[in-house]
């Protein structure tokens, strides 16, 4: 074993055991010999700002001490704490007293930090309420008002009110928010829709992209790019005109396509991959390659057992978090072994479908504004992406979309992500019909559709069903005329959520839907969360379409 030091300090060295036998892939080595497949990204200018450092950056060995000793059961707790004084003073005090015989780490943290509040956990539901009434009464509980930024806190202040998912998640999340907004619109909460629209536009203006969430430790990555879908929702519900967001959509697109023009064949830079035929497709990425602040110990342990350079594993874990599917067999070389994660080596079908929607939205809004050159440019970009997706990610033999491993030049696993091209109108009718058959036979259950057909212990795999996947499948199949399948998924999901609600009087993050009575979904790095933003949003929208279950 080799002892590898992480941020050693004069006072003490923290050592982590790392296997010397790195996992090597002949396909990857051959590609690396031919060309520098992944040039090192440059740091984004202006980030992080002086008050946007992550807790790991600020507290150095104190942060590692707290996280490595598991002072809090949830690794996210300490990064969400706010300091009671200048972090530098805290660090100096820590270095002075930590070697004292009577030093108590917990007491030190409690004396120098404000612990995060968990407001939604205090809510007690009324068992007499219908499912619809329960959701409508939860919106105020999950709403956070704009407040003055606590100096040096990891929470990024936003100008308007916003919805949080609930439980341990006390900040807003990018792609979660879109599915939450569906329910807000159905509940007549245009006020909150406007606030959230302004918040996301503000983040694009100030950070150049929409971060994973409004925490400093989320700034280095985004999440599935659904702002174009949000804009469409605002337009449909008369909340905000789509035209006002054209510049924001262009800025987000520039973030995802950064570096594309200079890429050679078989080369990747940040989110973009230049394929062997010259076409451009995208992958998930994080600009940092260190353990995530919010899952520090889990990441260190995963990397330790990987047999790979730790920074590679950390990057792939972070990119997996950026995907929203954290974690799934989609990103694993060996199903069931998180240490085999290779997120940055996969071209995801859902990401490229969302970017197709972004390109199409820019073209459509440019047409409304009379910007013909921009319209033509982005229609061509959308057409090119669609052709590349059909070439690399459509499995014609099996009639489904699949992710693509660009390093090995082979298709990856089938998952419910394959329905996103239907949701954004990217597929043709033959593809939609064939995909419907595959979803019916491999993912559909009496409780809804599962994330994948592979049981790995990860939360975005069998046996779990998730609200956003149900919504996109329902609407996607109905868009292509398969009302029967769309309605079946909708009724199955409403039955699942209502059955659990009648027993437990709450909605949760994910559900176990593979056989038997629907129950709490398992897997993942943290306990099951209730609340729950996007489940509430999707179910509230479905109740508006189908009535109470």
UniProtKB/Swiss-Prot annotation:
Enzyme Commission numbers on file: 3.2.1.28
Catalytic activity from the UniProt record: alpha,alpha-trehalose + H2O = alpha-D-glucose + beta-D-glucose
Designated name of the protein: Cytoplasmic trehalase
Superkingdom: Bacteria
Major subcellular site: cytoplasm
GO biological processes: cellular hyperosmotic response; trehalose catabolic process
GO molecular function term, any single one: alpha,alpha-trehalase activity
Summary of the function given for this chain in its UniProt record: Hydrolyzes trehalose to glucose. Could be involved, in cells returning to low osmolarity conditions, in the utilization of the accumulated cytoplasmic trehalose, which was synthesized in response to high osmolarity.
Pfam families xref list: Trehalase
UniProt xrefs under SUPFAM superfamilies: Six-hairpin glycosidases
EC top class named in words: hydrolase
Complex and partners: Monomer.
